[in-house]
């Protein structure tokens, strides 16, 4: 039986040259990559899409081609504004809820350039295949980053990835050639098949000058261990997140990360989290008296693990007071009513 399965595995695999790796100088060892037959026609330079959205085109994205600078010049790209790059996760597309909600929040609140990465031709496959070959998407993101760096400052570019998209961002950070990425935000980075990987091939704090992470479905769909400089754990960072009902596999909790992040864009004073060693200490008020914002308006350069509670539904911020003792008391009181 084992021999039969191995034979099927060999039949299902074929060597496909991924030209983008050796042609551009990006990527990893070897110029051949073993790909399943389902991906033999997948070409990253053709099948990974970059759509630009701005205040002038909020609903219809303009496709950007890193190899064609004119595609940027004829768009509504504002060279004086920041750039937010959004990378979706498994079984999603560029038009899924994550991309739409976060993109709309950025444009309406901050008026920035938003580039949505759409890699659905790979992300719709079985999870193990999407996971094994997401490095091809990461190389394309790295090429996009280096292309943009010719026209905007390094500090102007911020990459946000959800689920597998967070690891795509991290791998891109390993191979960029025009300076280290300034900031990467991981929204509940995927855990399955990745939690055993040490550093390379997943998101970690070496992939950008500053990496912040929001964990909401650790030990299930998400990665629980710290991955960045600053790791935030709303409601312990595990399922079931408040308001998610049964949530057997953690899907609702997995999505909660980008809903919290989307809300953080609108208010720079929300989602204050307490630096703490672990959740048990947080609940018992045995933490450092150090509070920091979670989300878009995070204080750059902070390090550590941070814990907070959120409400069952939007608005998720619990709105506690500024006094430290009152904060902890209010957090506990409000959470007991909502969880």
Question: Which residues make up each language-model segment?
Answer:
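Catalytic His-Asp charge-relay segment
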Residues: 210-214, 231
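The conserved beta1-alpha1 loop
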Residues: 87-89, 162, 188
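Glycine-rich nucleophile elbow surrounding the catalytic serine of serine-hydrolase chemistry
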Residues: 160-172
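Alpha/beta-hydrolase active-site loop signature
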Residues: 121-123, 191
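Active-site nucleophile loop of the alpha/beta-hydrolase fold
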Residues: 183-193, 213-218, 237
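Tubulin/FtsZ superfamily GTPase core signature
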Residues: 171-173, 181-184, 222
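Flexible, membrane-associating and regulatory peripheral segments of lipid-active enzymes
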Residues: 1-116, 123-133, 142-154, 177-179, ...
């Amino acid at each position: 039986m084992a021999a039969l399965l191995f034979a099927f595995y060999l039949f299902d695999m074929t060597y496909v040259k991924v030209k983008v790796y050796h042609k551009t100088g990006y990527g990893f060892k070897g110029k051949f990559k073993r790909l399943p037959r389902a991906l033999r026609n997948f070409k990253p330079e053709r099948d990974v899409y970059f759509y630009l959205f701005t205040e002038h085109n909020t609903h219809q994205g303009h496709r950007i081609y890193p190899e064609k600078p004119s595609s940027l010049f004829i768009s509504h790209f504002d060279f004086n504004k920041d750039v937010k790059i959004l990378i979706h996760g498994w079984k999603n597309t560029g038009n899924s809820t994550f991309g739409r909600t976060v993109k709309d929040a950025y444009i309406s609140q901050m008026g920035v350039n938003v580039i949505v990465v759409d890699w659905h031709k790979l992300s719709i496959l079985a999870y193990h295949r999407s996971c094994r070959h997401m490095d091809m998407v990461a190389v394309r993101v790295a090429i996009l980053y280096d292309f943009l760096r010719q026209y905007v400052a390094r500090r102007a570019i911020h990459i946000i990835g959800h689920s597998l998209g967070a690891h795509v961002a991290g791998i891109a950070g390993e191979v960029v050639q025009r300076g280290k990425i300034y900031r990467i935000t991981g929204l509940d980075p995927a855990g399955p098949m990745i939690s055993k990987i040490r550093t390379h091939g997943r998101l970690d704090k070496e992939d950008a000058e500053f990496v912040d992470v929001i964990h909401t479905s650790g030990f299930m769909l998400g990665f629980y261990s710290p991955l960045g400089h600053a790791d935030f754990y709303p409601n312990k960072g595990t399922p079931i997140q408040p308001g998610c009902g049964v949530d057997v596999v953690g899907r609702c909790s997995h999505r909660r990360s980008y809903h919290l992040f989307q809300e953080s864009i609108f208010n720079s004073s929300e989602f204050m989290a307490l630096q703490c060693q672990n959740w048990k200490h947080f609940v018992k008020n045995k933490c450092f008296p150090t509070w920091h914002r979670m989300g878009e308006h995070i204080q750059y350069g902070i390090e550590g693990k941070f814990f907070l509670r959120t409400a069952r539904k939007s608005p998720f911020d619990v709105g506690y007071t500024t006094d430290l003792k009152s904060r902890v008391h209010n957090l506990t009181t409000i959470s007991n009513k909502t969880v």
